[in-house]
């Protein structure tokens, strides 16, 4: 069974105002695959069509996806962009394990963010901070160093996510489109 963790970084929280800057897909206990807007051909810098199409095509090869807040953000953001672009969707009924949903349901945490859960579970990898100005520099100024920091943050998130998911597996009773 093919399983992957993934994360996306976007220019805004709403897909009708933002674009996908990068995505990282990590086959379970495999190597990260990095997809960057600044390294894919596009008509304009604001055109994430090819990136979204490529990421969705790769994600659709997996039976189970793991994404923190993936049910309400990552999958929906990608599908909103794909709908606008007229490209294939990330299966909206595909099986997903969403640690934020598991944490809300089975853990009593002060906050269900990936960083809080990872700190509490003392995972080897921890989230890295990224300051807001880096997004502006990456998007507006086309600052490659800022984009590199955002991509590295996304890569680290996927490592943290895999560790958190591994520790929360005992709480997964049913894998479905609702996050577990």
Q: Where do the protein language model's features map onto the residues?
A:
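Conserved DEDDh/DEDDy metal-dependent 3′-5′ exonuclease domain
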Residues: 33-111, 115-116
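Surface-exposed cleft-lining segments at the edges of enzyme active sites
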Residues: 10, 38-43, 146-148
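Entry/capping segment at the start of metal-dependent catalytic domains
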Residues: 1-31
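Acidic, Mg2+-coordinating catalytic module of metal-dependent nucleases/exonucleases
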Residues: 117-179
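Acidic active-site catalytic centers that drive phospho-/nucleotidyl reactions
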Residues: 7-9, 74, 98, 157
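A structural signal for short, well-ordered beta-strand segments and their strand-loop junctions
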Residues: 5, 64-69, 96, 126-129, ...
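Short amphipathic alpha-helical segments
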Residues: 17, 78-80, 166
